[in-house]
Amino acid sequence: MTFFFAANPEEAGARLRVVDAFQRKHPDIKVRTLLSGPDALQHVSIYCAGGKCPDVLMAWEFTYAGLAERGVLLDLNTMLAHEKTFAAELRADSVGSLYETFTFNGGQYAFPEQWSGTFLYFNKKLFAEAGVRPPPGRWDEQWSYAEFLDAAAALTKRDRSGRVSQWGFVDTWAPYYSALMFGMNNGVPWSDPRLNPTHLNFDDAAFIDGIQFYADLNNKYRVAPTASESQSMSQTDLFTSGHAAMALGGHWRYQTLERATDLDFDIAVLPTGPKGHAARSNIGTTGLAIASSSPRKKQAWEFVKFATGPVGQAVIAETGLFVPALRSAVRSPEFAKAHTRIGNIAVLTGGPSHAEGLPVTPQWPKIVALMDRNLGPVLRGSRPAVSLTDGLGPKIDEVLRTP
C-alpha cells in the first residue's frame, strides 16, 4: 500500500511513527511512503494522471475539492456504511467543523488528522521588559485590534538613527491569508456559504476594514517589517532571535521555536476587530483520503481508520508535532506533556472549536492566483483595501460561478 504525504524532516519522522505503529498492528499490510515535492497538488495530479495514484493521500482543506470533483478521491461514506460502530465513534470524538471540512457535495472525501489553525506566539521576556500585559491565552477572552496595536507599538524599538532593532509583530504565514484572517476577525466570514461558495465577501466594509488594518501594521503604523525590510532575516528568525515580540503562525512553527533554547515564549489568541464578536482562528486542517482507483482499498481503509482514529491520533499527540483532530487526543496528558514550553495550552486544545471555516471549492487554485496578484499592492501600501471591492471581488465571484 502506498501513502503520499508532504512534510519537512521533523514531520516526516512523526508520520513514520504512525506508519510503524500501524504495521505492528497489521504486519500483513506493508506501507510504502511517497514524500511530496514542493507542489503537492501538482505532484499527486501527475501520479494520478499517469495511472499510479497513491492508495492513501494526504488531503488539504483548500485543494481536496478539486480532486473530489474530478473523481480522484473515494467517498469514504461508502466504507463507513459497513462500519457503523467506527462511524459513530469517529463522529462523536471529532470536532464537527473539522470533520465537515472534508464533506463536499454530499460525500466525505477525507478524515481530518490535525488542526493547523493560526494564533499568536509572543516573547514573554520582551513583554515583561516593556511592562506590557501579555495577550489572552484562552479563546473565550478577547483583546481588540486597538489593544493589539498598542502592544505592538510599545514593543517596537528604534535606535537613534530611526532604524528598527525590535519589531512588535511579524507574520510567519502567507500574508494574503493573514490579511483575510484579520477581515474575518472583524466579524465577517470569508465566504457565503462556506462549502461551494458563490461569493467571497470583498464587498463587505467590515471585511475590507480588517484587511486594511493588517496592511497598515507595516505601511502606516510601522510595527511590522515590510517584505524588503525582512529580506536579510526571515520573519520566523526575527522572532526566534528576539528581534520581534509577537509572531502570527500555527502549530507548524512550534518545533522550530522549541529548539530556540534562549527564547521564552508562549501562545495567545488572535485579536478581534471592532465589528467582531469573539476571538477566532481558522479551520486549517489536513486529512487522509483514499484514491478511488486504488486496487488496495481494503488495506488503505485500515490505514486511514488507524491514523485518524484513537490509536493513531494518540501517537500524533505524543509526538507534539500536530494538534490532533480528535478531542480525546488533543485533551490527553500526552499532548500536554509534549508541549511543556507552552503555558496557554488552551489556545491549542480550544482552537478547533473556536475556528471559522475557510472556503471549500474546486476553484480555489484559481482564486489563490487572483488574490496573490490583487492583494499584493494593498499589502505593500500602494493601493487601499477598498480597491479590492471592485478590483478583486467580481473576478473571484465570476470564477466561482464558472463550472
Where on the chain are the PLM-derived regions?
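Long, aromatic- and glycine/proline-rich binding clefts that accommodate carbohydrate-like moieties
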Residues: 268, 318-373, 377, 402
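Glycine-centered hinge/linker elements that transmit conformational signals in sensory
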Residues: 150-153, 196-228, 270
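Extracytoplasmic/periplasmic substrate-recognition and gating elements
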Residues: 20-24, 30, 106, 130, ...
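Short, solvent-exposed loop/beta-turn-alpha elements that line the ligand-binding surface or hinge
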Residues: 77-93, 137-141, 159-161, 165-168, ...
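Conserved N-terminal structural module of periplasmic/extracytoplasmic solute-binding proteins
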Residues: 1-72, 82-91, 134, 228, ...
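Hinge/lid segment of periplasmic solute-binding proteins
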Residues: 62-119, 182-183, 266-268, 337-339
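A structural signal for short loop-to-beta-strand junctions that line the ligand-binding cleft
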Residues: 46, 54-55, 86-127, 277-280, ...
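Extracytoplasmic/periplasmic solute-binding protein
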Residues: 103-113, 118, 128, 144-199, ...
